[in-house]
Amino acid sequence: MDTELLKTFLEVSRTRHFGRAAESLYLTQSAVSFRIRQLENQLGANLFTRHRNNIRLTPAGERLVPYAEMLLNTWRLAKKEVIHSLQHTELSIGATASLWEAYLTPWLQQLYEQQEELRLEARIALRNSLVKQLHERQLDLLITTEPPKMDELACLLLGHFSLRLYSSFSLDLPKEDDTPNEHKNASEVPYIKLEWGADFHQQENRLLDSEQAPILTTTSAHLTRQLLETTGGCAFLPEHWQKEYPQLVIHPDIPPIVRPLYAVWLQNSDQQALIRQLLKTPMNNATQSVTRE
């Protein structure tokens, strides 16, 4: 069966409109209608009821939807595996947005400076999603602060990095000659919650000792940094950013939070040799706040 027929069927079922489906697929409306007729002929069943502009799935069409989605996903994975086998240097690396923005992008720059022929895929997602992809062999290498506890996974501690509480203004305790509101305590300013892992949140809550709800929860370190001045808030960001962004002010009364950084991959991965080779390039060359063990 032609996968393009299934793709067209799913788009029509989503839009409930042949014209809009044609626009999404960069086809003519007649081409979309022809593909649907082809699929209906192959299956021997009508997939849509058509009453003027009212297009609905028939019971047969409803039953086909999950199978069409599954077949297309399987086909995409099959193509990826075939391409993967032909390009031995291709490697997919996954991490959360905050880790990519703060630590991993400079590391990638180093890798490409050393090996121009590298073929990498940098994947950004939540940790739980990346762990699932790793387990299902859809991801080769996971960089995380919390390694999953699975027997089939290999784990390497890359080092540690420090996070500090920043704001765009001084959060020192007030002095006698200070004007009112010139300084604020960390618990008195809006807080932006940046996702650095479940263990981090326990340390975060203990240090801040504040019951106020965050004004924003995000996975992006750069978004957090850009909003500090706008919101007058504070957030935990990489310690080495003090040099890169001198407008950021560290809260001196809040100690740094030190987090581990791990590399995780499948023990029987066919990419083990390449993974170990890449991990020989230390991340502390790119960000001094990461130290090798």
From Swiss-Prot:
Domain HTH lysR-type: 1-58
InterPro entries, sorted: LTTR, LysR_subst-bd, Tscrpt_reg_HTH_HdfR, Tscrpt_reg_HTH_LysR, WH-like_DNA-bd_sf, WH_DNA-bd_sf
CDD domains hit by this protein: PBP2_LTTR_substrate
A GO BP entry: regulation of DNA-templated transcription
Function: Negatively regulates the transcription of the flagellar master operon flhDC by binding to the upstream region of the operon.
UniProt xrefs under HAMAP family: HTH_type_HdfR
Family from the record: Belongs to the LysR transcriptional regulatory family.
UniProt name for this protein: HTH-type transcriptional regulator HdfR
Source organism: Yersinia pestis
